[in-house]
Amino acid sequence: MNKLSINDVDVRDKRVLIRVDFNVPLKNGQISNNQRIAAALPTIKLALEKGAKSVVLMSHLGRPDGRPIHAASMKPVVAELENLLGKKIMFLEDCVGSKVEAACANPEPGSVILLENLRFHVEKEGKGKDAQGNKAKADDAAVAAFRASLSKLGDVYVNDAFGTAHRAHSSMVGVDLPVKACGLLMKKELDYFAKALENPARPFLAILGGAKVADKIQLIENLMDKVNEMIIGGGMAFTFLKVLNNMDIGGSLFDEGAKIVGRLVDKAKEKGVKLHLPSDFITGDKFADVAKSATASVASGIPEGWMGLDVGTKTNEVFQKVIEGAKTIVWNGPPGVFEFENFSTGSKQMMDSVVRATEAGTITIIGGCDTATCAKNSNATEKVSHVSTGSGTSLELLEGKILPGVAALSQP
């Protein structure tokens, strides 16, 4: 994961083409959350401070499926970016082609240029939909031409879009420039995951939640090669408990991943990984915040018509001690249905424990959309070591997969 960084590249008098992630939520044509734009500012500012002739920004927004759609235009980003950067932005009505190439060929020194949505072209991802809504595939020559046009817009390529680094799309792997570096946001992501996956301080603890074992098989198996302890929570804990303890789980989640639970437990024993499963639960009579609640344990089981929606008091106490003893923590998936206030206690208490561990010097990394939201709800985003900006990307990294967008970058 050690890649060339923009910190180590001479960009003076060069055009810097930066792949950013400006895929921001829009409401009535207005940006409702500017977090992703703000996250790219340090890289943009650094390029300008280092004397770049121009900074050319490219991103996707929404899912226009390879066709220009007004509602998915990057235009609303202009005012927000100007406000945050304190600088005039030149907006181009396309992202490739002769007009775009001409505008980017010799711009005023210090220019910041924002391209139109990359996903307005089917060649960006290689597939999309035609005007009639039918599936469309870009031919190889068109993809090559699209990539060649992008490559003419800069002298140095910088990728700061960690959230799409797991996709082998044209803007991630197809820019043909001699220098391809990671931006500051990408570097921070790679550095933190390297701390966990390449040389972790031990004991190394993985906390895994989520609904289905089947969705997390690769994640569990890969992390078992690396961690000392593993907490299994969320809906998938019930699949483990039914298989291992023959627990009555009522209407709780149970999935086809059940058939490999035995294999996963055997691997944990073989690798000396200590598995921690919940021992008690807060249950609900339906999947809703207003559900009636009760308590249950592994021994008592959960009656029919009820389901486990959070972990119980004893489980919280055990998990807290496990977290306190760890020196590196990777957390992907809350232990309960934190979206429902009545079933959020376990997730809140776990977040509090992780924050305290961080304060005591533990490296704590949060990945996955739900866990990141949980951190935000608890005002803990700045209180842990790192909250990843790319849920799909971080999951693939933790699964041991190679990220195409990272593999395409230059070595230092």
Curated annotation (Swiss-Prot):
InterPro entries noted in UniProt: Phosphoglycerate_kinase, Phosphoglycerate_kinase_CS, Phosphoglycerate_kinase_N, Phosphoglycerate_kinase_sf
> Which annotated residues bind ADP?
G210, G234, F338
In which broad location class does this protein mainly occur, judging by the first location in its UniProt entry?
cytoplasm
What are the recorded GO MF terms, alphabetically? ADP binding; ATP binding; metal ion binding; phosphoglycerate kinase activity
Q: Which domain of life is it from?
A: Eukaryota
Its UniProt pathway annotation is: Carbohydrate degradation; glycolysis; pyruvate from D-glyceraldehyde 3-phosphate: step 2/5
| Residues binding AMP | A211, K212, K216, G235, G308, E339
Record-level GO cellular component terms? cytosol
Q: Which GO terms describe its biological process?
A: gluconeogenesis; glycolytic process
UniProt keyword list: ATP-binding, Cytoplasm, Glycolysis, Kinase, Magnesium, Metal-binding, Nucleotide-binding, Transferase
Q: Which family does it belong to?
A: Belongs to the phosphoglycerate kinase family.
- State the function annotated in the UniProt record: Catalyzes one of the two ATP producing reactions in the glycolytic pathway via the reversible conversion of 1,3-diphosphoglycerate to 3-phosphoglycerate. In addition to its role as a glycolytic enzyme, it seems that PGK-1 acts as a polymerase alpha cofactor protein (primer recognition protein). May play a role in sperm motility.
Give the protein's recorded name.
Phosphoglycerate kinase
Species this protein is from: Aplysia californica (California sea hare)
